Amino acid sequence: MNNLKWVAYFLKSRMNWIFWILFLNLLMLGISLIDYDFPIDSLFYIVSLNLSLTMIFLILTYFKEVKLYKHFDKDKEIEEIKHKDFAETPFQRHTVDYLYRQISAHKEKVVEQQLQLNMHEQTITEFVHDIKTPVTAMKLLIDQEKNQERKQALLYEWSRINSMLDTQLYITRLESQRKDMYFDYVSLKRMVIDEIQLTRHISQVKGIGFDVDFKVDDYVYTDIKWCRMIIRQILSNALKYSENFNIEIGTELNDQHVSLYIKDYGRGISKKDMPRIFERGFTSTANRNETTSSGMGLYLVNSVKDQLGIHLQVTSTVGKGTTVRLIFPLQNEIVERMSEVTNLSF
């Protein structure tokens, strides 16, 4: 079937030749019908010989010229095509040389842009790490504040700054996340408690508590740093859009897969917003005057979840709250997926 495709392409590209040769032969036959002195038997012999030689010529040309395009169809690198001299005609060699120059130039641009991105990533990372030092010092100064009301307000703002810095750091590292992952069995409960501790100043100000219920074995095979980032972003959203209601957190077992749910009783997400919640920079169409949200939290979650093999489910009702469920993969599923990614990279 594939050969028939190439034959069809070849005949279509040579259709002008074929029509011209047929026209010349028909013209000779037409002349023989008008000129009775012209030997008809000799003419038929000439036409038959001409068509036969044309057929042989087309077959030989087909095998010679289609060879290059079959290599293109196999997605071979242009360097291999050029250095192995798969191009046989002058026009083919000119085409391959042009493609080689263009692709080489684009590759150089990609390498240059990648170096610039790496430098940008390094600059942002160093900036965040550097600014963490005065932020940590600020926390020590806040802890010395005697006025509890003022101290709580300062800790609330400090927690927001610290959270935004961490978010920026994760955004910067998104491109290199695959190189930055190490999978192991870790405790979901431990990760959740650690993240709750980081948000306690915000939850206290907003009058929000946490109902934690881990019913099943909570150990999952994942990368602890990126998994904590996902939990942090979901908790941050739950706190941001809730007030004076507890947030429920727990684990369940479904088809041997451990799932973690985080349920809040906040404003909820409208049906028209639901398809867009993972878009970069999207906040909400319901509260356009709100400036505290960056729209990066769920974008980060969505960008990382596939690398961790996590299946994400979000259900929400306006005015009643939102439930986010993280379904974790088994170890063999992660190993199999990583093997597929490795094979594709080669």
UniProtKB/Swiss-Prot annotation:
Q: How does it sit in the membrane?
A: Multi-pass membrane protein
Show the Gene3D superfamilies listed in the entry: Histidine kinase-like ATPase, C-terminal domain
Residues in the signal sequence: none
Q: Does the keyword Repressor belong to this entry?
A: no
Q: Which UniProt keywords apply?
A: Antibiotic resistance, ATP-binding, Cell membrane, Kinase, Membrane, Nucleotide-binding, Transferase, Transmembrane, Transmembrane helix, Two-component regulatory system, Virulence
This protein's superkingdom?
A: Bacteria
TM ranges are: 15-35, 43-63
- Keyword Transmembrane helix attributed: yes
EC numbers, comma separated: 2.7.13.3
Q: Which GO terms describe its biological process?
A: cellular response to phosphate starvation; response to antibiotic
| Residue ranges annotated for the Histidine kinase domain, each copy included | 126-332
Catalytic activity as recorded in UniProt = ATP + protein L-histidine = ADP + protein N-phospho-L-histidine
Q: Which GO terms describe its cellular component?
A: plasma membrane
Q: Which GO terms describe its molecular function?
A: ATP binding; phosphoprotein phosphatase activity; phosphorelay sensor kinase activity
Q: Output the PANTHER family linked to this UniProt entry.
A: HISTIDINE KINASE, PHOSPHATE REGULON SENSOR PROTEIN PHOR
Subunit and interaction comment:
Interacts with GraX.
Could you tell me what this protein does? Member of the two-component regulatory system GraR/GraS involved in resistance against cationic antimicrobial peptides (CAMPs). Functions as a sensor protein kinase which phosphorylates GraR through the auxiliary protein GraX. In turn, GraR up-regulates many genes such as adhesins, exoproteins, transporters, toxins, and proteins involved in cell wall synthesis. Down-regulates the expression of many genes involved in RNA and amino acid synthesis or glycolysis.
Could you tell me what this protein is called? Sensor protein kinase GraS
Which species is the source of this protein? Staphylococcus aureus (strain bovine RF122 / ET3-1)
